[in-house]
Swiss-Prot record:
GO biological process, one term: tRNA threonylcarbamoyladenosine modification
EC number: 2.7.7.87
Reaction(s) this enzyme catalyzes, per UniProt: L-threonine + hydrogencarbonate + ATP = L-threonylcarbamoyladenylate + diphosphate + H2O
Record's subcellular location: Cytoplasm
Function: Required for the formation of a threonylcarbamoyl group on adenosine at position 37 (t(6)A37) in tRNAs that read codons beginning with adenine. Catalyzes the conversion of L-threonine, HCO(3)(-)/CO(2) and ATP to give threonylcarbamoyl-AMP (TC-AMP) as the acyladenylate intermediate, with the release of diphosphate.
Keywords noted in UniProt: ATP-binding, Cytoplasm, Nucleotide-binding, Nucleotidyltransferase, Transferase, tRNA processing
Gene name in the database record: tsaC
Protein name in UniProt: Threonylcarbamoyl-AMP synthase
GO cellular component, one term: cytoplasm
Record-annotated membrane-spanning stretches: none
Amino acid sequence: MPTETTPRFRIRQCAARLQAGGVVAYPTEAVYGLGCDPGDPAAVATLLTLKRRDPGKGLILIASRVSQLSPWLGDAPLPQAVLASWPGPNTWLLPAAPHTPAWITGGRAKVAVRVTAHPVAAALCEAFGGAIVSTSANRDGQPPARSATQVRTRLGAEAAELADILPGPVDRSARPTAIRDAESGAVIRA
């Protein structure tokens, strides 16, 4: 799944950084994302500090395949509408597994998840071996980064210390991914 601008060895390096508790910036369908191991509270704290994000907002998890999301989801079968929309730019709120930490759910009973169609983001999840956190690479409330250069600009000097930046293209025509509640059908973000 590597692209011309994202060599396989860089994907492996960034996956190793995630496994070691680090934070990585990487391209997604619409913007650059910040990611970390969702099961590592120190890594999530670093990401939230870098982004200056309120932990009560919760975080999105992305994966390269549905099975990578299973540890974070409740036991109910996934609705057909969810499965039919993946891989793709569709994030769904689904019932969280009882052990899913509050730093991922924002203290709610649901978790936001997506199976990404972006080749670099999917390759990163594969190399990491599971789902990763995905939140836009910018300070909370600021415009999202759409290039590696913008990641450095938006996050400032801390970006060099806290985040490895994985090169690769984003779809410049794409809007941020839609977020919908799978149970109610409510559109959270169009």
